[in-house]
A protein has these predicted regions:
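Bacterial N-terminal signal peptides
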Residues: 11-24
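Extracellular/luminal regions of secreted and cell-surface proteins that mediate adhesion/ECM remodeling
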Residues: 28-286
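Bacterial N-terminal signal peptides that target proteins for export
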Residues: 2-12
């Protein structure tokens, strides 16, 4: 477990506690006025080492009122699932600058959409979570939507100078400015305990049952997509005609990471996998 995770849990606990007494506007962290480095091009990857260390197969109980249950089409009740963490480092020579989600919504540029259950904005086409049967090629998908792009931890394998401070730590809210992005040499992380960070294995989300066996977790950040129904194309893929990406990058070919896992027949509530000994508490959306 990385040292930053306990710190993140502590900060998250304070935010959850504050939710009981503070108005929604108070959740917007004060924007840190810092210069953004856009003299170059960002390059997102998926942290394969983190993914390899952060997964678990176990049974959990899903409440009908949970937003991930409603948005992901999951039947309330008990389900075996695979949970996992996803880190998306920026190894490019420039920051990824997103800024304030409210401005993107006002511009109708296709980067964000409003999530009625969570009452905040979600990214569109930020990442693709797939569970792959290596024999048949069948693919299951998770319904997780990206929410807030932040500098959460420095990426130790960054090839350039890694002495810069964080810049992006403000998600913002509806009507409250945010300041989002990923600085070069930093990584955003969606921890395994968060809502939607899982595949449902028993068909409880409407997909086919996942039999016990060996599988591949495949994560794609900033995936290519074909615009539908007048959907904006923010960044055209230079090597694939008609394919677009939400964020600019110097290299779209290094956006995928895969790890092999084994799904047992009866994982139980204690679970099977590298995170077996972790607590069972499930956090919020970020």
């Amino acid at each position: 477990m990385r040292a930053t995770f306990p710190r993140f849990r502590a900060v998250l606990g304070l935010l959850i506690a504050a939710a009981l007494v503070l108005p929604a506007a108070a959740f917007a962290v004060a924007v840190k006025e810092v210069p953004v480095d856009e003299n170059g091009t960002p390059d997102l990857i998926v942290d394969q080492a983190l993914l390899r260390q952060h997964w678990i197969v176990r049974e959990e109980t899903f409440d009908a009122t949970a937003c991930d249950v409603q948005e992901g089409g999951v039947q309330p009740g008990d389900h075996p699932i695979v949970r996992f963490s996803v880190g998306t480092p920026n190894i490019g020579d420039a920051d990824i600058f997103v800024g304030d989600p409210n401005q993107h919504i006002a511009a109708n540029d296709g980067l964000f959409e409003f999530a009625t259950c969570h009452h905040h904005y979600h990214f569109r086409h930020y990442a693709l979570y797939e569970l792959v049967d290596p024999v048949s090629g069948h693919v299951w998908r998770a319904a997780k939507r990206g929410f807030c792009m932040l500098d959460l931890e420095k990426y130790g394998a960054y090839p350039g100078p890694n002495n810069n401070d964080y810049k992006f730590r403000s998600c913002g809210a509806v009507g409250v400015p945010g300041f989002q992005g990923i600085s070069k040499g930093w990584s955003d992380v969606y921890w395994w305990k968060l809502q939607g960070q899982y595949f449902v294995l028993d068909g409880g989300d409407g997909q086919p049952v996942v039999p016990p066996g060996d599988y591949i977790i495949r994560i794609t950040v900033n995936p290519g997509f074909v615009p539908q129904g007048g959907e904006p194309c923010r960044n055209a893929d230079p090597f694939h005609a008609g394919v677009c990406h939400q964020l600019p990058e110097s290299n779209y070919d290094n956006n995928v990471a895969e790890v092999h896992i084994t799904i047992p027949d009866h994982p139980g509530r204690e679970g099977v996998g590298p995170l077996k000994d972790e607590a069972a508490n499930v956090a919020g959306d970020k």
